[in-house]
């Protein structure tokens, strides 16, 4: 059976996904055994596809800015898989920037 990652369907669910990214980084390996196929690939697939789902609500400019931050965050996590160089921390801080953008949209709607 193939693992199909959940795709966030709203701004609120995107905020939840960012919290998950912060907690599961930098390896995104499931320690519980419930999601053994979860990985950095599936985590960022979920986030990026969720951004596409919310594109109309976000607007093109915000959506692209969030995608750039997502790509930067992934690169930081990949460069520090053992959480020793500070890049993982920098990646986690990007989740806060993304949350600020998402919350600003949520307040307008």
Language model features: what each stretch is:
Residues 20-69:
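Amphipathic alpha-helical interaction modules
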Residues 71-109:
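Amphipathic alpha-helical binding modules
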Residues 1-40, 92-106:
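Short terminal alpha-helical segments
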């Amino acid at each position: 059976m193939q693992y199909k990652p959940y795709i966030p369907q709203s701004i609120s669910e995107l905020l939840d996904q960012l919290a998950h990214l912060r907690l599961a980084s930098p390896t995104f390996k499931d320690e519980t055994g419930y999601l053994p196929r979860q990985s950095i690939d599936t985590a960022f697939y979920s986030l990026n596809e969720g951004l596409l789902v919310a594109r109309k609500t976000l607007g093109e400019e915000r959506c692209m800015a969030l995608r750039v931050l997502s790509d930067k965050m992934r690169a930081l996590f990949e460069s520090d898989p053992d959480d020793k160089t500070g890049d993982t921390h920098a990646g986690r801080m990007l989740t806060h920037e993304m949350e600020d953008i998402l919350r600003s949209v949520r307040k307008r709607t």
